[in-house]
Amino acid sequence: MTLQIIAGRSGTGKTTHLMDEVGEKIKQNSKTYIFIVPDQMTFQMETSFLNKENLAGMLGTQIFSFSRLAWKILQETGGLSKTFLSQTGIEMVIRKAALDQKDKLKIFSRATSRKGFYSELANLFKEMKQEEVSIEDMVKSATNLSTSVNNKVHDISLIYQKYEELLADKFLENEDYLRLLAEKIADSDYLNQTEIVIDGFTSFSKQELTVIGELMRKCDKVTISLTLNVPEIQHGLDEYSMFKASTEAYYALLELAKLNGTQVEENKFFLENKRAKTESLAFLANTWGHNKFMSFKNEPQNLKIHQANNRRAEIEGIAREIRQQALNGYRYRDIAILTRNLGDYDVLCETVMEAYNIPTFIDKKRAMAKHPFIEFIRSSLDAILFNWKYEPIFQAVKTEFFFDITEKSSLNRRKADILENYVLENGIQNKWKWEKEGDWIYRKIRGLSTNVLPQTDEEIHMQSIINEMRNLIVNPLSTLELNLRKAKTGMEFALALYHYLEQVNAVERLESWRQRAEEQGYLELAREHEQAWSSISALLDEFVEVLGEETLDLDSFTEIIGTGLDALEFSLLPPSLDQVVLSDMENAKLLDMKVIFAIGMNDGVMPLRQKDKGIFSDQDRDALRAEDSKLKPSAKNNIGEEDLLAYKIISLPSDKLFLSYPAADEEGKVLSESNYLRKIKGQFNELNESVYLTDPSLLSDAEQSSYIRSKQATLGLLTSQLQMYKRGYTLSSVWWDAYNSYFENEKESIMAKQVLSSLYYENKTKPLQETTAKNLFGETIHASVSRMEKFFSCEFQHYAQYGLKLEERGHFQLQAVDMGEIFHGAMEWISAELKRNNLDWGNLTEEECKQMAKLAMTFLAPKIQHEILLSSKRMEYIQYKLLQIITRATTVLNEQAKSSAFRPVGLEVDFGLKGDIPPLKIPLQSDSELLLQGRIDRIDMAEQDDRTFLRIIDYKSSSHDLALTEVYYGLALQMLTYLDIVVTNAQKMIGKTAEPAGVLYFHMHNQYVQAEKELSDEAIAKELQKSSKMKGLILSDPVAVSLMDMTLEKGKASTIIPAEIKQNGELSARSRTATRAEFDKMRQFVRHKYQEAGNKILDGAVSINPYKLKERTPCQFCSFRSFCGFDPSLTSNQYRHLANEKAETILTKMDIEGGTQ
C-alpha cells in the first residue's frame, strides 16, 4: 500500500505522464487502474483515453468521479438500500423543515419566503457534510459570538435537526455516499489489486480525504497529482499564494499516509512547461503568481488582448477570430470560450455563433421554470391560492394545457384570446365569478347601456366560444381545488395534482409536442418536452417518498412544490465531436485545448469584487473559524483563489490565448479592464491592444476584410456600410466585392435582396386602390363627426380604426369616455324627468337639484361598463365624486336657466337614417355621397317677437373652447356641424325656421373657490357661477345675447356666456362672437371639409400624416402608434405643422375655400 504525489504547475505534463504510465503498466500486468477526476471532467478524460493509442481503448482502466465510484462500490457491497434524494428533493425537504420551525426562528422567519434561501441552506448543509462539521460543533463555536451569529446558528440548528428528522435515516444525499463509500471500501472485492490515480483536483474536502485514506489502506497504490508551485512545498506554506489550497492538500495527504501507515513513494516534481508551444505563453504561465516582477523582452506570439465597444461587438469579434482559426486548420473542438459571468454572454453567444455558422456547446444547465408545463403547474396552484385572479389563470391558459388536444393550436389560441378579452372587459377576478351558475352573457356594448337590444348572431356565436373555453378551464381547476382543499397529507396533495395533470391530458400534449419538434428537426426542444414530464414525475415521487405521510396545508404544499419547481433543470447533452465550448471559468474542466478565448475580463469580474453570499457572511465565517469551526474560509481569506483561476485560464491553451473585455455594457455604462490585463500588458511591453469595432470603416482594407467571415453575419455589416455610403461616406472595395458575392447564386441573392431592401425603406403607405377603398368604406360613406375629425388628424389612424376596424382591448376600468357618458346620461335623464313631471329648468330648489342628481346616478350606475361603479369600495367612492359633479352641474344649469330665455327643445337628439333628424348628405365624386350621423347633446331654443334662435350645448368632462384654427383644419367640426343640422332642419324640428344663436360647451366639474378672505354665501355662489361660465362662440346679436343672459348689464361681463357689454351697449372685443354671415360661412366651410374628407377616403388616402399644432399631436393618445411605426427622425415621417392664425385670417380662408355645395 503506497502513496505517490505528482506535483507541478499546469501544463508540465502531469496528466500525460499518469496516462502514459498506466498505459505501460497495463501491458505488464492484469491490475485494474481507476482514475478519479472531478464530476465535470469525466467525459473529457474518457475521450482522452479513447484517443490514447497505447491504452488500447481503455481496457483495464476505469474513469470515475468520487460519487460515481461510491455508486459502484455500494452496488457491490449492498449500501444502496436507502432512497437517494436529488437537489430538488433536498430543497423541498429543507423548505418543509423551515416551515415547521418558522414560529421558533429568530432571524430567518422572513427569509423563508425569499427565493434562493433554500438553495443557500442546501449548500450550507452540503458544506457541513463535506467538511464533517456537526451541528453540535457549530452551536458550540457560536456560543461566545455576537447575537446575530448566535441567532443564525440557532435557526440553522432548528432547521437542520428537523431536516434530519424528516430524512429519518431513510434517505441519502450525494454527500452521504462519500461517507458510506469510506465505510464500505474495506469490504469491496472490486478494489482488490487496483491502483488509484487521482487527477484534476486543486484541494480536497474532509470527506474526500477520509475516502482517500481508506483507499490508501485498501488499494495497492494511490497516485495523486496536484497543481502547485514546487518551490513552495520545499520552502513552506505561503498564506497568500494562489497554490495555498493545493499545498495544504499536499501536506494533508502526507499526514494521512503517516496516520494510516502507508508507504510514501518518492514524489515526482514536474517543472518544465510542456503544453505551451510559444515562448510567450510559456513565460506567462511560468511567471504567473510570482512575487518578483519579470518582463518579456520580445514581441509576444499568439497572445492577444482586445477591447470591444460592448459585449456584442466582443462576441462578434471572437466569432470572426474563430472562423479564421478554422481556416488555419483548427477544429472547433480545439477551441473554448471562457467567461466569469456566463449569464451575460450565453444568449448573445448562441445568437452570434449561429449567425457565423460556428457549432457551439454552451456548458450551462438551464432552469426548467420557463417551460410551459412547469409554468402551467405553478400558475394553476397560484390561481387557487389567489382566488382565481386574472394573471395566474391566463398564465396557465397560455401554456395551452387546458385546450382540446384534438383541435388546432391556432384555433384554440384565438378562442383563448376571445375569452381573455371578455374576462378583462368584465372584471372577472375571483372564483365566484368564474364558477357562477349559468352561461356568461356576451354583449358588444361599451360604456353606458340604457337601451339594450336583443343579441345578434355574432354575439351569440362569441358567447358560445367564451363559455366553451370557460368550461375547459373551470372543470379541471375546480376539481383540483376541491381535491387540494380536502387533502391532509403529502400523498393526498400529490395525488390531487397528479390527477389534475391526467385530467388535462398533460402527457399526451407533451408527447405531441415532442413528436412535432422531432419531425421539424428541433431535437433539443424535443428532449426538453420529454424531460419536463419525467422531471415532474420524479419530483412528485420524491415528494411522496419523503413527505407522503406528513400533515400539510395548502399553503405549505404550494410553497414546497414551488421550491421543487424552482430547482428543476434540463440535463445537458455532452458536446458533439466538433463544437466550440462556451463555459464558465470556475467550473470548466477542459483538456487538450489549443485556443482559448477569455472574455468579459473587466475590473470587478477578474479578480472578482467579493460580496457576501450564502447564509453566513465573511465576517460570520471568520468569527466561527476563530472558535475552531471547520467551515470553509471566508472569500476574503482566499485571496489566492482569484489568481489561481486566472492562472488556470492562461495556462490552459497550448497554442493561442485571446483575452478581451467590453468597454461598456448594454446601457452604455463604462466598464474598465481587469487588473490582470494591466499586469499582462506590463509584463509584455511589445503587446499591443487591438479593438473589436462595431463599425470597421475606419480600418484599412485588409483589416476590413477580416470582418467578412460568414454570409449571414456579413450581410448585417454590409447593410450598415451601404447605409453610410448613402450618406456620402467612402465605401471600401472590400464591401463592393462582398455585395457582388451575394448575387452569385440564387438562394443567397434572395436573402440579400430581402435584407438590403431596408436601405431603401421608407415608412410610407400607398393609397388604396379604388375598389379596395370602396370595399372597405362603401360607395356611400356612413360617418360620424368624430370619424371625420380623426381623418383630418391622421389618415392612417382613420384607416386603422374604420377601414381595418382595429380596436383596443377593453379593460374593466372607468375611463374618461365613460365619465363623459355618465354626465351626458345624467343630464338627459334629469331633463326627461323634469318633462315627465311638468317641471322646468330654473324652477328647482337646491334640494330638488340634489335629489334629481341622486336619482339619475342610481339609475345610471348599474348600466355603465358592466356595473363597474358597483364593483368595489373604491368605485363606490368614485361614484360619490361623480354624483357631486352631477349635482353641481344640475344646480348651475338650474341657476343659469333662471337668467336665460333659452330652454331645451331636444336632448340626445339622433340624426341619421334612423334618427329624429335626417342625416347631413354631402355629395362626393363618382355619384357617391357621405351621410353624416350622430347625436346632439342638447338643443336650446329662444324666441322674441318674430325671431327664433337655436343654439347647441355640449356637455364636457374637461374644459373646451371653440378654436377656429381647429375648425379650419378639420379637427373640431362637431359643434358647427350640429348647429348647421338643427338650423337646416328647424322646420322639421320646431315647425319654423330659426337663426343660429351659437355653440357652447358646458364644463361638468366640481368647482372650487379660492379666496384670500372669508366670503359670504352669496359671494361664493357668485364666484361658482363665474367658474361655470360656458365657452364657445355666440351670435353677435344684442337680442340673442340678451336672451342667453337676461341679467347682463352694460359695462359687465356675463357669468353664463362668453359675452361682455360695453357702456354704449355694444359687445366688447373680449366677447366670443360671430355674425350671422360668418356663421353661414363656417357652416358652408364645414360641409366643404366633409366633402374633402369623403373624396380622399374614396381615393384611398391612408397616409401616415399626423398633424402638429403647437405641442399637440394625435400621436399622444393614439392606439395605433406601434402599428403605424411613425418616427419623426425618419425623413419619410414628418408632422404636418399647422399654423395657429388669427380668427380674421381663418374666416377669410374659410370664405375663399368653402365654395358652394
From Swiss-Prot:
* Keywords annotated in UniProt: 4Fe-4S, ATP-binding, DNA damage, DNA repair, DNA-binding, Exonuclease, Helicase, Hydrolase, Iron, Iron-sulfur, Metal-binding, Nuclease, Nucleotide-binding
Identify the residues that bind [4Fe-4S] cluster. Answer: 794, 1115, 1118, 1124
Q: Which cofactor does it need?
A: Mg(2+); [4Fe-4S] cluster
Q: Where is the UvrD-like helicase ATP-binding domain?
A: 1-278
Co-factor binding details: Binds 1 [4Fe-4S] cluster.
Q: Give the GO cellular component terms, alphabetically.
A: cytosol; DNA helicase complex
Q: Which GO terms describe its biological process?
A: double-strand break repair via homologous recombination; recombinational repair
Which class of enzymes does this protein belong to? hydrolase
Q: Where does ATP bind?
A: 8-15
Q: Which domain of life is it from?
A: Bacteria
Give EC number(s), comma-separated.
3.1.-.-
Q: Name one GO molecular function term.
A: metal ion binding
Q: Which SUPFAM superfamilies match?
A: P-loop containing nucleoside triphosphate hydrolases
Q: Does the keyword Heme belong to this entry?
A: no
Family annotation (InterPro entries):
ADDB_N (IPR049035), DNA_helicase_suAddB (IPR014140), DNA_helicase_UvrD-like_C (IPR014017), P-loop_NTPase (IPR027417), PDDEXK_AddAB-type (IPR038726)
Do the record's keywords include Protein biosynthesis?
A: no
Q: Which family does it belong to?
A: Belongs to the helicase family. AddB/RexB type 1 subfamily.
Write out the function statement from the record.
Answer: The heterodimer acts as both an ATP-dependent DNA helicase and an ATP-dependent, dual-direction single-stranded exonuclease. Recognizes the chi site generating a DNA molecule suitable for the initiation of homologous recombination. The AddB subunit has 5' -> 3' nuclease activity but not helicase activity.
Subunit structure and binding partners:
Heterodimer of AddA and AddB.
- What additional remark is attached to this entry? Despite having conserved helicase domains, this subunit does not have helicase activity.
What is the name of the protein in this document?
Answer: ATP-dependent helicase/deoxyribonuclease subunit B
